[in-house]
């Protein structure tokens, strides 16, 4: 019995945008930047989806949580 073919396409590793552009700051008041890292359901996107490094993903998560606390970002949107 022949083996199934391996994946032809190799996924390219995403580069952390904050490491690439040194002048970009993560701030809880910058809602336009933070909305890129929040799904339409209000969940914080995973590191493998966003391509952030460990430290910057932590910083984004903390900034999103702080932004939710002061009501700049919603906790969740209407699902239905």
From Swiss-Prot:
On whether Ribosomal protein is a keyword of this UniProt record, the answer is yes
Q: Which Gene3D superfamilies match?
A: Ribosomal protein S18
Question: What cellular component terms from Gene Ontology apply here?
Answer: cytosolic small ribosomal subunit
Q: What start and end residues bound the annotated signal peptide?
A: none
Pfam families, alphabetized: Ribosomal_S18 (PF01084)
Output one GO BP term.
translation
Q: Does the keyword Ribosomal protein apply?
A: yes
**Alphabetical list of PROSITE patterns matching this protein:** RIBOSOMAL_S18
Where is the chain membrane-spanning? Answer: none
Q: Which GO terms describe its molecular function?
A: small ribosomal subunit rRNA binding; structural constituent of ribosome
Which UniProt keyword terms apply here? Ribonucleoprotein, Ribosomal protein, RNA-binding, rRNA-binding
Give the family this protein belongs to, as stated in its UniProt record. Belongs to the bacterial ribosomal protein bS18 family.
**What is this protein for, i.e. what is its function?**
Binds as a heterodimer with protein bS6 to the central domain of the 16S rRNA, where it helps stabilize the platform of the 30S subunit.
Q: How does it assemble?
A: Part of the 30S ribosomal subunit. Forms a tight heterodimer with protein bS6.
Entry-linked HAMAP family: Ribosomal_bS18 (MF_00270)
Name recorded for this polypeptide: Small ribosomal subunit protein bS18A
Record organism:
Rhodococcus jostii (strain RHA1)
Q: Which gene encodes it?
A: rpsR1
């Amino acid at each position: 019995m022949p083996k199934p073919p391996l994946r032809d396409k190799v996924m390219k590793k995403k580069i952390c945008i904050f490491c690439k552009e040194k002048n970009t700051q993560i701030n809880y008041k910058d809602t336009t930047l933070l909305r890129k890292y929040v799904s339409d359901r209000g969940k914080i996107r995973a590191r493998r989806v966003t391509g952030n490094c460990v430290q910057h993903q932590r910083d984004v998560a903390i900034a999103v949580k702080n932004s939710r606390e002061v009501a700049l970002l919603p906790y969740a949107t209407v699902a239905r």
